[in-house]
Amino acid sequence: MRRRHAARMNTQRAAFLWSVPAVLFAGDALAWGLATHVYFAQLLVWAVPLLDPDLRRAVRRFPQRLMAGACLPDLALVGATARTRAFDASHRWETAHAMLGAAHDDASRACAVGAMSHLWVDVIAHNHFVPAHEHLWWNVPMLTHAAAEWAMDCHIARHLFRQPAAMLQADDWLADYVARHFDCTLAASRRAVRQLAGAERLLRHSQLPGMLHGVGRVLDRRLSSRFDYYIQEVTTRLPQINRVLDGEVPAWLPDCPPVAVARAHRRPCAGTGGVPDAPAGRPV
């Protein structure tokens, strides 16, 4: 009896843990997890020189606004549960450019740069990191996408100064900012930010990223070195964000399109302006 009860509890726990990807990825899949986005946003403070002096000053004065802004494009994931369509376009270049263009103080500038950094590093994820792991692991796009990005979150988490959920709900400033820039009510903004922070916190407490990373290291002996490789590839190309901050619109997509669409889009974009260089010699 006790063994049957334990088995049933394990089954229920597994079902609960795997329901997290199902909930968060019910719509369009995005890319890197929030922890990974916050890590790359951190680099803009001291490791990556921003050419615009106003933006450079802004991110150094308000690093927490920068890192909170790096979470905002993923509001697209919670728009339906927050009962608003205001965030349908939150993961698009034109939205991030509009946020930057409307910034009138250093806090707003830092937040907009964070949102831009989210989209910029997603280009690497969608066109290199995720396809590589769909090829190396298993070709189940939604599941592989979630597993790879959350394993990366675990791999990179020790380098974070603060967790994404804490920065999303640090004060009321972010909710006010979101309401203004996404043209929604303050109540809808607070609800969406709270739900995104709650989903992120639930994911961390579930220990699913750690489980995926641990299983991945057992089944894929080169996982750690490959993840370090992709971190280095993104870091090396991060200074190219200056071109986007200067108004350039990259040809590559920040959203995750169907595989056939992505492949068709990548061919004509190869070697064009506004495109981060493809990582050379991707390890397998």
Which role does the model predict for each range below?
Residues 2-6, 10-114, 120-284:
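N-terminal leader/auxiliary helical segments
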